Structure formats: structure tokens, C-alpha cells
Amino acid sequence: MKKTLLATAIVGALGASAAAQAATVYDQDGTKLDVYGRIAMGVAGGGPEYDSNGNFQDNGEEFVDVFSRLGFRMSQEVTSDLTAFGRLEWRFTGDENDTDGGFNEIRQSYIGLQSKQYGTFQAGNFDSFYNQFVSLPFDVYIDRGLEFAGHRKQSRGDSIGYYTPDLQGFTAFLQLKHYSVRGESAPNAEGTVIAPQGGVRYQQGPFTVG
């Protein structure tokens, strides 16, 4: 496993944090559009390693991209309590002149409805609610493989989810990901599968448990 020696975010007008450093492009009559992103690069090394087949690899130092991204957030107030929203985010290779696959992943693409009274429902391609409510507050280094095992199995594409409004510090969430065999010439033995995920998070000031 490569050891990350240095990971320095190079911050422009869009800022380093997608959540806190979004730039508002349009905000009028209940309609809002934000753009956000980051260019993050580091230096990785670690000497001799072995691949999954046990073959020797001499891994010297190199510049690496550390999850650079660019995205948009959209929202429209439907009523005083109901807001429709959407998000679209790409990952790109920030450390190379990659003209063919620079934007190499659609990381987020979803739409939803948010109510202060009834909670939030969304559908599409998004991070697991476990990751959003439990893992992220603890700043887990997912590039080192330290993440909930079901993150991609229960989210990221063909997913729907719901989480409650804040209930005196408690937030409950439920998420479902649909696996379909539609169009496959040789369906797998499991057939169509729905992978569920749920939990409860309690947060009070800097204290979080979930």
C-alpha cells in the first residue's frame, strides 16, 4: 500500500471544502445555483510493494491526485417548507494532462425534496447516508481503505434514501440500492437485489455518535 507523504490542497476561488466553500452563481426568487470544487494533489511513495497477484513492484515517489472534483448544487423553493434540489459532481485527474479521461467519474448525480417538518428524500447516485452522517464527522481516510464495507454496495447509483429532520439531536436514515439483471444475457444467481442500509445518528455540538 502506498504511503501518502504529503497531500496539499491547492485552493483557488472555489475553495478546498465542497460543503463550506461553494461559490453562489445565482440566488433569486427562491432559485439558487452553487458551484464548488477543489484541486488536491499529493506526493506518494513507499518503496517496494506487491500487487494482488504477488508480483514485485518498485513503487517510487510520484505526484498523485487526491480526489479533485468539480460540482454544482441547485435548489428551488416550492413552498415555505418544501425545497426541490439537485446535485451533479465530477472527479477529475488533477495531477496529469489527461485529455481523454480527465473527468473520469460522475461522483454525485441526484435529485430530491427537503422539508423542515418531514425530512429529506432523494434518489439517484450519491454517497451512503452512513458515510455522510457517521464516517465523515470522524474524518476517516477512505483512500486508505478505512471505510464502511457497504458504502458502495448500498449507495452510488440506482439508490433512494430518506432521513428525518433533526429530532432534538437525533437523525434517523434509511437507504436502498437496487441491483437489476435487466438486459443481462447471463443473470447472476441472486437475480434482482435491493441492498438496504439504515441507522441513527446523535449530534450535540461537537459530540457525535452513530
What is each of the regions a protein language model found here?
Residues 134, 184-186:
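Short, well-ordered secondary-structure micro-motifs
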Residues 1-23:
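Gram-negative bacterial Sec-dependent N-terminal signal peptides
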Residues 46-50:
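Cytochrome P450 core scaffold surrounding the K-helix E-X-X-R motif
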Residues 186, 193, 197-210:
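Conserved acidic, metal-coordinating active-site core of Asp-based
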Residues 24-45, 57-178, 192, 201-205:
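Outer membrane beta-barrel
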Residues 15-16, 93, 210:
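Residues in and immediately flanking transmembrane alpha helices
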